[in-house]
Amino acid sequence: MSEFKIVSRKDLYNEGEGLGEDYDSNSSSKNNSEHVEVLVPPTEFEFVEVERTDSSLDLKESNNSAHEQKEEKQEEFEFPLFSFGVVEASTSPAQEEQGSSTQEKDTPQTEVSLMKISLKEPEEEIINQERPKDYYFASYSADQKLQFQQSSIDYDVIIQESTKILEDDLRIRDKWPYCQGRIIDLYKHNARIELEQQKELKIKKRRPGQKQRAAKKLALERTKERDTKAREIKKQLKKKFHKRGGKKNKKKVPLNPLAKAGSTPKFRTE
């Protein structure tokens, strides 16, 4: 510990030469043969430009993936319930026929891997059932909009065309009053139809004359006569073709085929 010297922070930031001289004078009394060098720290900062990279982000992603893999491994574990321990390797049919004891000893043995059970729950699939905006909102190009403007009719155009039609109608009426085409005054037309309907109602409601009343009575009498004659003819036809049998109520005698079995047969010659 005699080789080291306690130096204050103020002495460290002084000039190197003055500090070296003081240190040499003090150390010469203790150890003249040894020479100790003192390193002065730099007082200026060095500015270094470093290009930024995404290594930090890559590290974060790698850490996250490693963490996820670790969690997955923790959720999966081996379950030895259905494992059967050690199973002999399958042999060829020729070796099975030999059945030597040496082959049974030398057969390699393989271990069955244990069943893995995972506690992970299946993630629910998020199905987006929304229709696209094109289904609700139509988007037209500039050419289509121009076509719509050309094919559409404004209010001013309708008024302008209607005035032209009225002018044409007046001109036709003035020049050819007898050839008006389909131009109809609805008020006059409806009034004429109403008059015709009223005339028809009056004709229906008025009382018929004496001759008409007599003709109606005669027609009713003759229709009655025709009906009575038709009924009589129908009755006569029924009596003619639908006669009742006379033996309807006679009692039937049961037939006995052995009633005349003892009688002698009769021939034509007898």
From Swiss-Prot:
UniProt-annotated stretches for the region Disordered: 1-76, 90-111, 204-270
Stretches with biased composition (Basic residues): 204-216, 236-253
InterPro entries the UniProt entry points to: DUF2011 (IPR018555)
Basic and acidic residues bias (residue ranges): 1-13, 49-73, 218-235
UniProt organism field: Saccharomyces cerevisiae (strain ATCC 204508 / S288c) (Baker's yeast)
Biased composition (Polar residues): 90-102
Top-level taxonomic group: Eukaryota
Signal peptide per UniProt: none
One Pfam short name: DUF2011
Protein name: Uncharacterized protein YNL050C
